[in-house]
């Protein structure tokens, strides 16, 4: 994929994350700065989502660790364990917020 296609896909991912957090009414603030989306919970915990254009990867940093995801077909899959991006992020958000959360729909 071209760099502009990757940037558009990653913008769409950031939009989906922010929308899902808003729709769930989580006690969390999101801040998007350049290639980084920071999710901060009332507890002070944070989850960081970063797009890495050079490698065309999406990265997640959370208390549970750091994860790198590459596009495979229509999904973003972790290089370390084959986990799916949205499932991994949902678990990190549940852990940080202490609330039920998913990306269904």
From Swiss-Prot:
Transmembrane segments: none annotated. GO terms for cellular component: cytoplasm. One of its GO terms (molecular function) is ferric iron binding. One of its GO terms (biological process) is iron-sulfur cluster assembly. InterPro entries: CyaY, Frataxin/CyaY, Frataxin/CyaY_sf, Frataxin_CS. PROSITE patterns: FRATAXIN_1 (PS01344), FRATAXIN_2 (PS50810). Signal peptide: none annotated. Keywords: Iron, Metal-binding. Belongs to the frataxin family. Involved in iron-sulfur (Fe-S) cluster assembly. May act as a regulator of Fe-S biogenesis. This is Iron-sulfur cluster assembly protein CyaY.
């Amino acid at each position: 994929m071209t760099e502009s296609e990757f940037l558009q896909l990653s913008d769409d991912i950031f939009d989906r994350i922010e929308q899902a957090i808003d729709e769930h009414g989580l006690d969390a603030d999101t801040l998007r700065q350049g290639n980084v989306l920071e999710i901060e919970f009332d507890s002070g915990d944070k989850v960081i989502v970063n797009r890495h254009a050079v490698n065309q990867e999406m990265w997640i940093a959370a208390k549970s660790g750091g994860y790198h995801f590459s596009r495979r077909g229509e999904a973003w899959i972790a290089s370390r364990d084959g986990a799916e991006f949205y499932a991994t992020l949902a678990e990190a958000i549940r852990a940080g917020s202490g609330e039920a959360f998913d990306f269904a729909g």
